[in-house]
Amino acid sequence: NFDAPGFIWRFTKGETDYCLGINDFPDFLLNYQFRESKVDEQVLNLTPIQSRALFEALLVNAMPQNRVYRYNFLFDNCATRPRNMVEMVLDNKVRYKEPGESLPTFREEIDRYAGICPWLIFGIDLALGSGLDRPMTYREQMFGPEILEKAFSEAVVQMSPDSAAVPFVRFRRVLPKHHFI
């Protein structure tokens, strides 16, 4: 509940419990289209067996006893949780292309996301302190959905030592926006 007393403080400290919601894809898409938000689809290069295993892992994650989880906006969020499930199904065979440039610190990356909300930045600085000043790893930077999308699009997967690496993303498309009156 975003309106609960102390939500921002608890959020920045990683003390908020989130409840996983389940929607049919058409309902999800309609919601994003209503908000005029962009939806990028990445179809992953999975075998039918891997696709089924991922689907089953998602079903287990959505079971009533697993739906509520301690949300951490850096380490256990809507980007990191599915990434971890995909990597588990692929037995950690995803190989990410490491960026050539130096990576930002946690503080720099959080400031970029928090934008023009100085009170949010202040709260995060207060709650997380000097640990924010070390450079992130590329994997840690994937807490941001657009960084994860880029990482997936540049990654390869090699199923066995004697097989060729193939692109992790089979294809990508931006789903059309519909404007509502």
Where are these regions (language model features)?
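Soluble extramembrane regions of membrane proteins in the secretory/endomembrane system
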Residues: 1-179
